[in-house]
């Protein structure tokens, strides 16, 4: 009954609880009215609050509105094969008072990805999520799959990715979801993934650069670069380069780059203010795992901003997001310090569904159509660090990334 639960039918709101003998109904065009069975009359105003309401958005995925022979509206849940006269959107009504000012944002840190997608149907949309076999990436992929999107889980370990696909299919057997191999630590693997993806001849409407590594001991990839830098930044940079033609053909399309608030606690320029490769991919003697992670997260925002500047004229936007503080996931398995900190902070952390919310919000919010080059935290735009806002550093990082790839593979494919 997962789809029914996600539709909101289990939710109640004590403030809007009706008196005995009253029933809440909706019209064909979404207006809420109230039936008083005791006095056999109807009215637009809630009998307790006096408010007028309407349902928000489309019906949840898998639902259809029909009318019976008496002209009464009813609803068919095709996923769970049930019929009801209760509009599933009634759990998400909004006040009919558009002129009343409000300072409350629609979503916040407690919002889940499923709540953001409630009532949305993404049939025909293709979503690619890297690192989607667990954690935030899995919740992002699952949320889209349960709302009709064709979702591709791009992961280093195909076996674990296939297990993640099975978990999604257990929730809804008709979900359109598949796994593909992508190792961001190997540039040739990124290239092979892009070739395999293009061979499918599908569109690409949302690309979520989610995969990442944290607290690794110093090491070099097969391409001769420090692992954290290549996995968290350069691999994603190359992936987007290879798929940018597909994104542009699929426009409007969106790229979401998962960064972190830790980007604020580092810098990647030398004393003269120039981008310094030795800070991005340091030798063993200068390596500190936490600093390497922070620098890669700064690269994420700079990359997202420059990507938006270059591709937005072609209908592709990009935004960077912070998923949440002290969220334990598989990327932290290498750090005993982080495990200890997480154990202490766990009562105050987000769930993985909440952690995926900002990513999903930036991927689907109608108010962000055509907008990008921004940084979001708790589904709200906020300013990143001053260095993350530097257009000069963003351009320099882009050019350096292109050179690093070209030096190893030759001219990038497209």
UniProtKB/Swiss-Prot annotation:
Organism for this UniProt entry: Mus musculus (Mouse)
Gene: Wwox
Induction / repression: By hyaluronidase. Up-regulated in outer and inner nuclear layers during retinal degeneration.
Region annotation (Mediates targeting to the mitochondria) ranges: 209-273
Post-translational modification: Phosphorylated upon genotoxic stress. Phosphorylation of Tyr-33 regulates interaction with TP53, TP73 and MAPK8. May also regulate proapoptotic activity. Phosphorylation by TNK2 is associated with polyubiquitination and degradation. Ubiquitinated when phosphorylated by TNK2, leading to its degradation.
Phosphoserine PTM positions: 14
Tissue: Ubiquitous. In the brain, expressed in cortex, striatum, hippocampus and cerebellum (at protein level). Detected in embryonic skeleton, in cranofacial bones, vertebrae and limb bones. Detected in chondrocytes and osteoblasts.
Binding site residues for substrate: 260
Record-annotated active site: 293 (proton acceptor)
Function: Putative oxidoreductase. Acts as a tumor suppressor and plays a role in apoptosis. May function synergistically with p53/TP53 to control genotoxic stress-induced cell death. Plays a role in TGFB1 signaling and TGFB1-mediated cell death. Inhibits Wnt signaling, probably by sequestering DVL2 in the cytoplasm. May also play a role in tumor necrosis factor (TNF)-mediated cell death. Required for normal bone development.
Pfam family, one: adh_short
Protein's UniProt name: WW domain-containing oxidoreductase
């Amino acid at each position: 009954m997962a789809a029914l639960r996600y539709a909101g039918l289990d939710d109640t709101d004590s403030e809007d609880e009706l008196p005995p003998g009253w029933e809440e109904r909706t019209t064909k065009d979404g207006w809420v009215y109230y039936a008083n069975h005791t006095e056999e009359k109807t009215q637009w105003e809630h009998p307790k609050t006096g408010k007028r309401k309407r349902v928000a958005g489309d019906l949840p995925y898998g639902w259809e509105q029909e009318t019976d022979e008496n002209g009464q509206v009813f609803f068919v849940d095709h996923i769970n094969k049930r019929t009801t006269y209760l509009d599933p959107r009634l759990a998400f009504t909004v006040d009919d008072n558009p002129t009343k000012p409000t300072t409350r944002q629609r979503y916040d840190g407690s919002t889940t990805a499923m709540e953001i997608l409630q009532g949305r149907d993404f049939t025909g949309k293709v979503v690619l999520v890297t690192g989607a076999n667990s954690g935030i990436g899995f919740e992002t992929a699952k949320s889209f799959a349960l709302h009709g999107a064709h979702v591709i889980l791009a992961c280093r370990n195909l076996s674990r990715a296939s297990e993640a696909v099975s978990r999604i299919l257990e929730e809804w057997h008709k979900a359109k979801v598949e796994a593909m191999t992508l190792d961001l630590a190997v540039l040739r693997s990124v290239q092979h993934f892009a070739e395999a993806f293009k061979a499918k001849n599908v569109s690409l409407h949302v690309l979520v650069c989610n995969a990442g590594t944290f607290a690794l001991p110093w090491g070099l990839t097969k391409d001769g670069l420090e692992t954290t830098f290549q996995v968290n930044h350069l691999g994603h940079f190359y992936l987007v380069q290879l798929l940018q033609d597909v994104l542009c053909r699929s426009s409007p399309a969106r790229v979401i780059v998962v960064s972190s608030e830790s980007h604020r606690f580092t810098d990647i320029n030398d004393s003269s203010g120039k981008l310094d490769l030795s800070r991005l991919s340091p030798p063993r003697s200068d390596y500190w795992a936490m600093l390497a992670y922070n620098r890669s997260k700064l690269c994420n925002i700079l990359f997202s901003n420059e990507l938006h500047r270059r591709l937005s004229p072609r209908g592709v936007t990009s935004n960077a997001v912070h998923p949440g503080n002290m969220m334990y996931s598989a990327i932290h398995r290498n750090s005993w310090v982080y495990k200890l900190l997480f154990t202490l902070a766990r009562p105050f952390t987000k769930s993985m569904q909440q952690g995926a919310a900002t990513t999903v919000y930036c991927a689907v919010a109608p108010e962000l159509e055509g907008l990008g080059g921004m940084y979001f935290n708790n589904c709200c735009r906020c300013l990143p660090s001053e260095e993350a806002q530097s257009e000069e550093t963003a351009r320099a990082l882009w050019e350096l990334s292109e050179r690093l790839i070209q030096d190893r593979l030759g001219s990038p494919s497209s």
